[in-house]
Amino acid sequence: MTALDRRYDTQIHRRVTRTVMVGSVPIGSEHPIAVQSMINEDTLDIDGSVAGIIRLVDAGCEIVRVTTPSIGHAKAMGKIKAELSAKGCNVPLVADVHHNGTKIALEVAQHVDKVRINPGLFVFDKPDPNRQEFTESEFAEIGTRIRETFEPLVKLLREQNKALRIGVNHGSLAERMLFTYGDTPKGMVESAMEFVRICDDLDFHNIVISMKASRAPVMLSAYRLMADTMDQEGFNYPLHLGVTEAGDGDYGRIKSTAGIATLLAEGLGDTIRVSLTEAPEKEIPVCYSILQSLGLRKTMVEYIACPSCGRTLFNLEDVLHKVRNATSHLKGLDIAVMGCIVNGPGEMADADYGYVGKGPGIIALYRGREEIRKVPEKEGVQALIQLIQEDGLWVDPDETR
């Protein structure tokens, strides 16, 4: 398939990557795109952290990240893992390590399934306000120090067959990268590639990469450039997508979707996190909605509904609400609710079932493209349920919990 053909293809073709196991969850192009989040409890609060992780898992989270800013926090991860195991919860855990984190990472690697490091902070020198440039020798000297500091962690993760996320943040690039490449996607990519090349030299390949920024255009550019750079150098590591510091409410969700969905539609991305300034479990439905909207994972009913107009023969918003309340537990179905017969039958043709205004007070029920029966509007929702039951696709809500 040519690039032009791919541009107009209705199927998303994912960038081919290797598989990286994070605990029991595979990340890579041959597997469903994994959904993850991060608790906001203090890691030293063992009970609170365990409760937060379980809330995320109950919401559908598949990988959970936990902050580990000190050795004490790293050791607490062992207790958290044990408490979760005792409760029958074996969700993969990721430790988040930042400033000068070698000792922390070496400790926490014993207790988790993946370690996330930030290349801009892993070997951290306080910026010098009087510095005018970085010479090649100064740049190389810090690179040598990074390798010496990073190598023990890579070897430990390799021995334990655990995973690493090289997680670049646009807002925390190292001073030498800023001087050399500027505050740019190129600087983000080179920051990650420095660590990728060290891992490759040490024959360690359980790597996932992220290139997060708080502005979607920067994030989009960085991920695209990262994928291209890896392709050029022969690397095929999976990508973790996210827009960092997206905020809250509708705008936070829209901002995250603008970045994440755009890349997913281009075939980039193997695991995602929507970062909201809200309870972490509220991030999870947004992730699944993004994936379903692109046809990448189907975990809920797909509702197709017109926006309503003067031709609409019933209160579309109220009816859609009633249909959703009655059927939202039927995962995997497509149900269309259309206001009239002008566009309804054609626009809902791909749906499993259709509920269409046929005339004043009358609705028609469809199975695919076939009209099955007409019923009074007041009986419409129950008649839809009956049709689904006749086809053997109905389950009671309690059975899906």
Curated annotation (Swiss-Prot):
Q: Where does [4Fe-4S] cluster bind?
A: 306, 309, 340, 347
In the record, the note on similarity to other proteins reads: Belongs to the IspG family.
- Which coenzymes or cofactors are required? [4Fe-4S] cluster
- Species the sequence originates in: Synechococcus sp. (strain CC9902)
Gene Ontology biological process: isopentenyl diphosphate biosynthetic process, methylerythritol 4-phosphate pathway; terpenoid biosynthetic process
Annotated pathway: Isoprenoid biosynthesis; isopentenyl diphosphate biosynthesis via DXP pathway; isopentenyl diphosphate from 1-deoxy-D-xylulose 5-phosphate: step 5/6
| Name of this protein | 4-hydroxy-3-methylbut-2-en-1-yl diphosphate synthase (ferredoxin)
Q: Which gene name does the record give?
A: ispG
Q: What class of enzyme is it?
A: oxidoreductase
